From Swiss-Prot:
It comes from Anaeromyxobacter sp. (strain Fw109-5). CDD domains: ArgRS_core. HAMAP family: Arg_tRNA_synth (MF_00123). The lineage of its organism: Bacteria, Pseudomonadati, Myxococcota, Myxococcia, Myxococcales. Its EC number is 6.1.1.19. Keywords: Aminoacyl-tRNA synthetase, ATP-binding, Cytoplasm, Ligase, Nucleotide-binding, Protein biosynthesis. SUPFAM superfamilies: Anticodon-binding domain of a subclass of class I aminoacyl-tRNA synthetases, Arginyl-tRNA synthetase (ArgRS), N-terminal 'additional' domain, Nucleotidylyl transferase. It is found in: Cytoplasm. A motif ('HIGH' region) lies at residues 131-141. One of its GO terms (biological process) is arginyl-tRNA aminoacylation. This is Arginine--tRNA ligase. Its main location: cytoplasm.
């Protein structure tokens, strides 16, 4: 990467100056970033500002000295200019050939271009989706799935060893409610009149499970006590729903390396071992809510106690119960959290931190992709990890805001098929996998997303995924035209590349070469939307360049063989970056596209 080369030159210069006693060794890291205004150069370096205090020198004076040392170590003359600016930044302008050789590496590396080793040697578990196995996936789950898959893909491209994990909530009240819903439908199949309770599951899939159980067991469970049929009906229902969820995920091309069962967490003894571990570390005690005084000796905030009691109410716990409480307030949480109820059963939080305890033993870092409504849950998990001897920084939570589904600007709230919330499958069936995946990434995950079904179906340039894919197809057709004109797609030629001198061509070169840095930064920030933004902005720059060339006569293919070779190579590098970026996001990069709006795909190239 070009940026890495700038960093290396500055490190050499700083080390040489320190060895000669002109300034102390730089212990902290310094930044190398592209300035917002290209007039200020290719990169701005803050090394002098970081080192100034230790060196006992004004940052600008130190910057001048460092710049001189960088010039001295730049034996290959890769830097065309260094200028001290502002409070002590060093603005760097690279020699043109540095950018052109970097462009050559795009094609040389091909499908691997953009991969880095930022995370080499580090194991990460990315847990995403983890929708309760009580029904098919809705569009909110779909956004979680696509964002989570984008995060894991970015981390793989950055060199991390990634495990994709789905936590199956197949233990507890919700799956028991599902089992009872199936049993009611099972009774219906024998002609009985039943009333579905308000919290039951009404979907057609419940009837399917009931029908399968009837076919296999007849009326065996019709009048049997609940204790005899509950586990069977629960397991069959969960198995069936997980099958539906897997199909939904395959529809958007998402697979997991591991499906981690909450039930297995209990059956394997992991939860019991975890509780013993907490007791041995004196991290739990028996008490009541509101919790005892916090670490600073002050009563816990009334609101925090109230919130805790409210949360517990959902698990059937009263504030007056004797509970086994985890000392989470000692680690930054608002209140101590219960891990065991008065009746001896464990809480959801207990299983969740036991699961994170298990994950942390298998990986160096954890990424949880959660709905935005879980934001208040995050401090509890962080406190738990810290109490268990890990670092809060070992856990990163990506929050997913809701999706507002619209059709031509009108809200779509109900499914035509099920009479409930719209399922992910319905959206994918109507607009396609590529549009679904890409549009879910057209906004930050922590911002609400408006998903217009009609826009997603359009084969027009106002559809963001069509716009990017059309750019890739346009490039493919340019090469087809070039072959017809007897101008084969060239290998890298520095002399031909030196003809790429226009401002638009230079801008495209810098955008293309920035691809690996962008991916690495997006991976470390867990933000796959950056890739979608980059693709849209980069192809917009190309469409503008292409259109202007047709208008001015500076077409890609011209009578000037050297210019043609240079421009075709630029197009080849851009096509590779688009394909890699789309592939990383799980979106196809078509070679040909046609719609009434794009029939002149490669005319007058």
């Amino acid at each position: 990467m070009v940026k890495d080369r700038v960093i290396e030159l500055f490190r050499q210069a700083l080390a040489k100056g320190a060895a000669e006693g002109r300034w102390p060794a730089l212990e902290a890291s310094f930044s190398v970033e592209a300035p917002r205004d290209p007039k200020h150069g290719d990169f701005a370096v803050n090394a002098a500002m970081v080192l100034a205090k230790a060196a006992g020198k004004p940052p600008r004076d130190l910057a001048q000295a460092i710049a001189a040392e960088v010039r001295a170590v730049d034996a290959q003359h890769e830097i065309a200019g260094l200028e001290v600016a502002g409070p002590g930044f060093i603005n760097v302008r690279l020699a043109p050939d540095v950018w052109l050789r970097a462009l050559g590496r795009v094609v040389a590396e091909g499908t691997a271009y953009g991969r880095t080793e930022v995370g080499r040697g580090k194991k990460v578990i990315v847990e995403y989706v983890s929708a309760n196995p009580t029904g098919p996936m809705h569009v909110g789950h779909g956004r979680n799935a696509v964002v989570g898959d984008g995060v894991q893909s970015l981390l793989r491209w950055a060199g991390f060893e990634v495990t994709r994990e789905y936590y199956v909530n197949d233990y507890g009240a919700q799956v028991q409610t599902l089992a009872r819903s199936v049993h009611l439908r099972y009774q219906e199949l024998f002609g009985r009149q039943v009333t579905m309770p308000p919290k039951s599951y009404p979907g057609e899939y419940v009837k399917d499970v009931a029908a399968a159980l009837k076919a296999e067991h007849g009326d065996r469970w019709l009048d049997a006590p609940e204790a005899e049929w509950l586990a069977l009906f629960r397991d069959r229902a969960v198995e069936h729903v997980l099958g539906l969820i897997r199909e939904d995920l395959r529809a958007v091309n998402i697979e997991f390396d591991r499906w981690y069962s909450e039930k297995a967490l209990y059956e394997s003894g992991t939860v019991d071992r975890f509780l013993r571990f907490l007791a041995e570390k004196d991290l739990v005690y028996v008490g009541k809510l509101p919790p005892p005084k916090s670490k600073k000796g002050q009563p816990a905030p009334a609101q925090a106690a109230s919130n805790s009691a409210h949360d517990l109410g959902e698990e059937g716990i009263a504030a007056s119960d004797d509970l086994t409480l985890f000392r989470s307030s000692q680690y930054g949480d608002e209140v101590d959290r219960p891990v065991k109820k008065a009746d001896g059963t464990t809480t959801y939080f207990c299983a969740d931190i036991a699961y994170h305890w298990d994950k942390r033993q298998r990986a160096d870092a954890l990424v949880d992709v959660l709905g935005a409504d879980h934001g208040g849950y995050v401090p509890r998990l962080e406190a738990a990890l810290e109490a268990l001897g890990a670092s809060r920084k070992d856990l990163h939570v990506v929050l997913i805001q809701m999706v507002n589904l619209t059709r031509g600007g009108e809200a779509v709230k109900m499914s035509k098929r099920a009479g409930t919330v719209v399922s992910l499958r319905e959206v994918v069936d109507e607009v396609g996998r590529d549009a679904t995946r890409f549009i879910f990434l057209t906004r930050r995950s922590d911002a609400q997303l408006d998903f217009d079904i009609e826009l997603a179906k359009r084969q027009t340039l106002d559809n963001p995924v069509f716009y990017v894919q059309y750019g890739h197809a346009r490039l493919a057709q340019i090469f087809a035209k070039a072959r017809e004109a007897g101008a084969p797609v060239p290998e890298f030629d520095l002399e031909a590349a030196r003809t790429l001198t226009s401002a638009e061509e230079q801008d495209l070169i810098r955008r293309i070469v920035a691809f690996p840095d962008m991916l690495a930064a997006a991976a470390l920030a867990y933000e796959p939307h950056r890739v979608a933004f980059y693709l849209q902005e980069t192809i917009a720059a190309f469409h503008s360049y292409y259109t202007q060339g047709k208008r001015t006569g500076e077409r890609v293919i011209s009578a000037d063989a050297r210019k043609t070779a240079g421009r075709l190579f630029l197009c080849r590098a851009l096509k590779q970056v688009l394909a890699n970026g789309l592939g990383l996001l799980g979106v196809a990069a078509p070679e040909r596209m046609e719609s009434p709006e794009t029939r002149d795909l490669a005319d007058d190239v």
